[in-house]
Structures are given as C-alpha cells and as structure tokens.
Amino acid sequence: MKEEILRLLRSADGYISGQELCNRFGVSRTAVWKAINQLKEAGYEIEAQQNKGYRLMAAPDLMTEAEIKSLMHTDWVAKEVLYFDTIDSTNIKAQELAEKGYPSGTLVVADKQESGKGRRGRSWVSPSGTGIFMTLMIKPDINPNNASMLTLVAALALSLIHI
C-alpha cells in the first residue's frame, strides 16, 4: 500500500484526502496514517492539511523498495522488488529466488555488493552510494545461445531513455 500511496501522491496535482485513500485501498484512516508515517520516516516530506489531505512536497535521494515500485509503470518488470542495503551479490540472490519460484521480472537491488560479479564471472566492485546494482530475473523463451545478447539489448534500451 505504501508504494501505491506514494505513486498517487507523485501523480496528484494537489492534495489527496485521507478518506479517498481509505476508500481506494479499503482500509481505515489509521492504516493510511501509519503508511504515511512510514513514508515520512523513510525521508519523504509529506504535508498533511486538515480538510485537504496529504501532499508530497519532496522525496529523499534514496533508493528504496517503495521508491522503485512507485516509479515503475509496467505490466511485469519489477512487480516484485527486493531491496538490500548490502548483499553478497544481486545475481546470487536472484538465482536463489528463481529456485524458490519467484516470477519472471523480479528485481533484486542493492546499494552495496560485497561479492558482485560482472560478465564472465569477473569481480564487480560495487561500493555503497556509487551506483545502482541490480539483477532483473527474467525467464525468456529464447535459445540459450542468444541469452548473452540480452545484456546488450538492455544496455541499449537504457541508453536510449537518456537521449
């Protein structure tokens, strides 16, 4: 619910009433208040005005699960997001999750990797605060010989977004 509240606050032109949030999610005002407070504790500046509702004033410069989910507008990619401050390797974690049956499109993100791996098993230095370290778990219906091309296609797609 936090991610959805954050998404609504981001897209709103003004205030969103607490009652509107209650109705939308089928929860009590207390549940909405708790979710808003959790967002505030995470660094979001949310203004609350009596008889008006809530308004997002500023977002922290942080990468969190709620932040990532609130910015994703997709049918399958990152519907499931797992965020870690520190992890051995996002790739190893994604492999573990795949074995547990997590769906295609699961995104594993970390601020720091202690044993990050790059292409061909090379060591990937990934200290805190220096990048976005992630593994997108996909189960494509392609020939395994073509799987190595997916990294190139993803990099190209991301570069085109910033042009």
PLM ranges: what are they?
Residues K2-A157:
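N-terminal lobe of the biotin/lipoate ligase/transferase fold
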Residues I161-I163:
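Conserved small/polar residues in nucleotide/adenosyl-binding loops
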